[in-house]
């Protein structure tokens, strides 16, 4: 630090003095003293750094209240709405499935008022928080009962803990999956107190492999749907119906983790087939787990369907209380499931399915409408084009299947990657940030998930 800079440090006002200035009164009333003091400390640290580097005061030091208000206006909430133009519909980092309007309304109502979360109107006493949603799930899938926890990882962990702690769990080697966040089935089994017994090989597993692994300490026969990868070629796998029959023969419960889980046949919408929970229940599987916020299109939740005797054991375990869903989740899940009672209106009412089934021709027309106004804004520095591309479903759902789509691409005229980086960085600071993807030296805006063209143009023109 140079000697010339020292007097300038003493010109920086004390925080207490600043907070007591009359000009600060409106800010104190709006934001409170804790946030103001914290923000002033940040500004003072930046002012010291500026003095140390340039040996002068920053311009904004002449008007601390104005500088403070500007900084407070720039503060962003922890969760901020964005334009998802990445091409991944169920983007884990961007919150997965958007909720239906009816689910949003149900959550809002649950937040505003006392609700019958664990209260029975029939008996005027304590009820069970999963009951209403469980009844709806059973009606939709044919399951005897259901259990709801806060996500599918929790569902798998609860199932393994209750059904097979201290026992062996038999799983095919080709199904020992890892999902996002290093969530590995073998690790989960270890934490649940289970002993993993691998059978078969990576690409081929037969019913006899399961049968040969069964002994007096076998607690569970398990299948895991490989929702985030695919093994093709010389393969063989045991069906849920075959494994369920073996379990019944040997008096050993069976379970399948579906991961995504869809309550409707996706092929009716032109999408690839995905196993449905009701198919597994009909095949005789004792317990089935899947997510609420993937193909189902609801809130984050872990759903366990199955035989009543096993679901009751899950509900009674102390771990269930630690993993239970709150009233907002249950309200959103209930409203989402009710949409499935009218399957012919599902595309119209369920946002995630609407985005997944959006025709490529409609997306191309959107790109044509946006091209000219965006060239007017960015054509000086970038070459803008309309390109065909492939969207993906995301969240580990149908990993090898792609959806035909269209994108706007931005190619920097100076050929520099830093120009693209500067553009994407600026778009991340917008009131509603725009998130695309960079590939092949271009920025791609896949328009599959864009439903408000005017709002996007307002942001990008700002």
Curated annotation (Swiss-Prot):
A Pfam family annotated for this UniProt entry: SelA
Cofactor needs: pyridoxal 5'-phosphate
Involved pathway(s): Aminoacyl-tRNA biosynthesis; selenocysteinyl-tRNA(Sec) biosynthesis; selenocysteinyl-tRNA(Sec) from L-seryl-tRNA(Sec) (bacterial route): step 1/1
Catalytic activity, as annotated: L-seryl-tRNA(Sec) + selenophosphate + H(+) = L-selenocysteinyl-tRNA(Sec) + phosphate
UniProt-listed InterPro entries: PyrdxlP-dep_Trfase (IPR015424), PyrdxlP-dep_Trfase_major (IPR015421), SelA-like (IPR018319), SelA_trans (IPR004534), SelA_trans_N_dom (IPR025862)
Keyword annotations of the record: Cytoplasm, Protein biosynthesis, Pyridoxal phosphate, Selenium, Transferase
Cell compartment(s), UniProt: Cytoplasm
Residue positions, PTM N6-(pyridoxal phosphate)lysine: 294
Domain of life: Bacteria
Molecular function via GO: L-seryl-tRNA(Sec) selenium transferase activity
Family per similarity comment: Belongs to the SelA family.
Protein name per UniProt: L-seryl-tRNA(Sec) selenium transferase
Biological source species: Yersinia pestis bv. Antiqua (strain Angola)
Taxonomic lineage of the native organism: Bacteria, Pseudomonadati, Pseudomonadota, Gammaproteobacteria, Enterobacterales
